[in-house]
């Protein structure tokens, strides 16, 4: 009977590996910009970006904003956006219409939302306490739609709650421009 144990152990290990591989094959692929509806992407690319965008945090007026663009960051980085201070849980709205292109949690931005907007611009909302419940990649949002809530996730966990808002003209994370002059 003791000679059956190695055989059973090998079968159990093989079964585990097969189940693990099957589970990995059934997991959905990670969302990407290429999975967005092509017709809506083209429609957005054909639109012009407004010269004035609303401040995307509820109750915050432009005159209280501080231009934090270009400030030094760790690892020889510079700040590619503006930080908008507000109490945790304050509503964050889309500054433009567009497609929700990415929702994730990462080390730098914490909980983030990427929206592809007019003229192929990309709008980055970071350090969120949470995304709006039910918000999904591929959703079409209008200017002023709720997308999340102010927080201090990611590398901002030891700072006051705020929204980091970034604007990119050459693709997701490429061609950063100062969003401060756009916000009204």
Positions of the model-derived regions?
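Zn2+-dependent peptidoglycan hydrolase active-site motif and core
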Residues: 95-137, 162-164
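A residue-level detector for short acidic-glycine micro-motifs
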Residues: 67, 86, 102, 127-130, ...
């Amino acid at each position: 009977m003791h000679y059956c144990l190695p055989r059973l152990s090998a079968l159990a290990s093989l079964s585990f590996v097969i189940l693990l591989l099957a589970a990995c094959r059934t997991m959905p692929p990670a969302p990407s910009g290429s999975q967005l509806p092509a017709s809506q992407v083209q429609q957005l690319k054909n639109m012009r970006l407004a010269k004035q965008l609303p401040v995307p945090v509820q109750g915050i007026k432009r005159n209280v904003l501080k231009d934090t663009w270009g400030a030094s960051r760790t690892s020889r980085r510079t700040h590619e956006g503006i930080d908008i201070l507000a109490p945790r849980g304050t509503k964050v709205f889309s500054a433009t219409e567009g497609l929700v292109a990415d929702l994730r949690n990462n080390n730098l931005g914490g909980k983030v939302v990427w929206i592809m907007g007019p003229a192929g611009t990309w709008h980055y909302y970071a350090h969120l306490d949470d995304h709006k419940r039910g918000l999904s990649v591929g959703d079409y949002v209008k200017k002023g739609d709720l997308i999340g809530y102010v927080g201090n996730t990611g590398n901002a966990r030891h700072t006051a709650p705020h929204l980091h808002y970034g604007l990119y003209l050459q693709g997701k994370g490429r061609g950063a421009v100062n969003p401060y002059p756009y916000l009204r």
